[in-house]
């Protein structure tokens, strides 16, 4: 339940075995073994049915997003704001092995209590995000032309996130992006 209540967390849900039925923004989704979804704090998540095991990987913007990451692997990057739909990834066996190495390292790092732990956790998180970004780019066959379209979607979501209280019209965001409202 805390996973569903905390509105500040970025989330990875990774089905380890069986299936997981969820609702994201009132849209039902069923995830199978070795599938991952990425969610932002703006997504409303409801876990409907757990028929197996899943790993939840969560972090808040104070831990990761405030650092100077480039657009591709930031909280405003491809995984979290690259499309208008929820990012759902099907992992190959080799991708599962690579991501499992990182999650195993994270588990080990949690046991080490020293002044370097936070930075090491941040590095491992970035590695996890980079690998998932590569998997997503491969899935969506991101070419240089398509990259521009994804960048536009990313920029739009960042603007909405930052200005939604005072800006209500598509025209407002189109002006900030120097675009016609019809192109958004």
Residue ranges and their predicted role:
Residues 90-93, 113-120, 132-158, 162-177:
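Short, Lys/Arg-enriched, Trp-marked, Pro/Gly-tolerant hinge/linker segments that flank
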Residues 11-14, 98-102, 124, 128-131:
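Amphipathic, well-ordered alpha-helical segments in soluble domains
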Residues 1-30:
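Generic protein-terminus/edge-of-domain signal
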Residues 21-23, 39, 44-50:
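Short beta-strand His + acidic residue motifs that chelate non-heme Fe in jelly-roll/DSBH
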Residues 48-108:
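A hydrophobic/aromatic-rich effector-binding and dimerization subdomain
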């Amino acid at each position: 339940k805390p996973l569903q209540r905390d509105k500040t967390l970025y989330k990875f849900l990774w089905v380890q075995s069986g299936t997981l039925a969820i609702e994201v923004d009132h849209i039902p989704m069923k995830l199978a073994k070795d599938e991952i979804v990425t969610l932002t704090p703006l997504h409303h998540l409801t876990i409907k049915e757990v028929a197996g095991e899943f790993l939840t990987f969560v972090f808040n913007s104070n831990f990761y997003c405030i650092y100077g990451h480039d657009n591709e692997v930031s909280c405003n990057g491809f995984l979290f704001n690259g499309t208008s739909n929820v990012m759902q990834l099907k992992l190959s066996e080799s991708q599962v092995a690579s991501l499992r190495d990182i999650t195993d390292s994270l588990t080990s790092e949690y046991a080490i209590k020293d002044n370097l732990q936070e930075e090491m956790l941040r590095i491992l998180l970035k590695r996890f995000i980079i690998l998932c970004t590569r998997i997503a780019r491969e899935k969506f066959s991101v070419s240089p032309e398509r990259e521009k379209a994804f960048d536009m979607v990313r920029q739009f979501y960042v603007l909405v996130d930052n200005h939604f209280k005072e800006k209500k019209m598509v025209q407002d965001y189109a002006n900030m992006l120097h675009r016609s409202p019809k192109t958004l």
